[in-house]
């Protein structure tokens, strides 16, 4: 079977099945009453000065990408059904999944911005998000589950509960668009944390490394152990550390109040507590290896 070239709008009352490589010539819209299936590669062909083409898919059934998707400007799927991805998807612009995105393998999504309105089912696979803008992970209005390792190389806009069975790595900046809870075995928060006055709870079984100073986070809660790899960590509201806290350098903590339930290891560094209200240090906890403590 030879290559298939798609142009314009294609409407079917039943399914659409493309068993060979597909080239998208110009902006294409596919409307189907049944499944839409691509067995091999989907490739966008530049249309002169118009640039890479857009691909819009509308079906209440399943859309399956069996091969890589590349050279598209934007990719948009409608609500209802699911999008099943079996390989990497790359766009120069935005990716909008209004239906559930199901990972059939570990893969990377690359583009401008990403929206997962229909949720994500990782099915035990790894997901890497490589977007120059923000990838919006809204666990408040939809379900994000089944992802093993989650890595974001660019920005993330987060809300609700985001749970992984493997590690979470946020290499870019993270923005809270609602009260957010992150759950998994371990995490690295390497970029800035912009809270937009929302609460952040991190619940990891292994120590979490925080390298950001934090900005406009309301209440912060860490259920597990934390490594503070920053000179300052600031919240608008309270800071609650339920696990062990370890300093990797001199650190100032600023907020309305602080609570340390399980001790702090200064590792030879200085700690400044800049809380406006009461700082609670549990009597069973131990503050040790501190160079100096300032209140």
Show where each model-derived region lies:
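Extracellular lectin-like interaction modules
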Residues: 1-295
